[in-house]
Amino acid sequence: MFKSGFVTIVGRPNVGKSTLLNAIMKEKLSIVSCRPQTTRNNIQTILTEDNYQLVFVDTPGIHKPKHKLGEYMVKSASDAMKDVDLVLFLINPDEKPGRGDLFIIEQLKEVKVPVFLVLNKIDENPQEKVAETLKTYSELMEFEEIIPISALKGKNIDLLKELMFKYIPEGPQYYPEDMIIDQNERFIVAEIVREKALRLLSEEVPHGIAVEILQMKKNEKGTYHIEGNILCEKNSHKPIIIGKGGSKLKKISQYARQDIEAFLQSKVYIRLWVKVKEEWRDNQSLLKELGYKNMK
């Protein structure tokens, strides 16, 4: 008997959805940063085992939108809860249910599929706090399963997989067994660069950056030559991203190259520039060019 199902992970921004997905896959597939809203596009990730296939949709965190990109991110996360077989609602025990959580719960009450409550970061919180959080959320909604985990340390991830297998239906293998992600290489490369930029930049440049891959060529020796732009919204942000004598941009390039080489399994040369694109997050045509799907 072979089983297959689509699973979506939802939760407030920065709750650890991408870290959880990476723990399940044991691969660095989804951009992970300490900043909220770092996942901007639905990424379908495929886990194939001998007797089942799980297709995960890693969504942006649900938040109040402030621009067209924000509107897209919220719609993208909400749409992901439709037409799936299982929903994982990820929370942190050290945070009381806020307006965002209550908004998500109201949406979850409308779905017709099993919903798991997954408590992350249990290793960072006392048992009393975890128990208190469980009680609070259980009173707000009934969940098919409640699983405490540590996504960062991999605790109870195997248990979570076993429970997901239990709830998904019998079905075909939708993707080839060697396929782990449905985004193209350029998208992944751009996300890796953006992650490094977010990690290295100060709070002066929050989410107003994007990465545009201009060229990605592989020579006869198997080496990739990549060129790209880091886009920012303000002229004042450009020198911050570049750094003194180009030091910050150089670090972004170095750290990105290491992860890109691991992803592509090839040697990589990368050159990055910084360009100012004012209000790019409200530019629908540019958002489409940057890979944000279904923009209307």
Curated annotation (Swiss-Prot):
Q: Which GO terms describe its cellular component?
A: cytosol; plasma membrane
Sequence segments annotated as region (G2)? 37-41
Keywords for this protein = Cell membrane, Cytoplasm, GTP-binding, Membrane, Nucleotide-binding, Ribosome biogenesis, RNA-binding, rRNA-binding
Outline the segment boundaries, as ranges, of region: G4.
120-123
Query: Which GO terms fall under biological process for this protein?
Result: ribosomal small subunit assembly
KH type-2 domain location, by residue? Answer: 201-278
Residue ranges of the region described as G5: 149-151
Summary of subunit composition and partner proteins = Monomer.
Report what the protein is called.
Answer: GTPase Era
Give the species: Clostridium botulinum (strain 657 / Type Ba4)
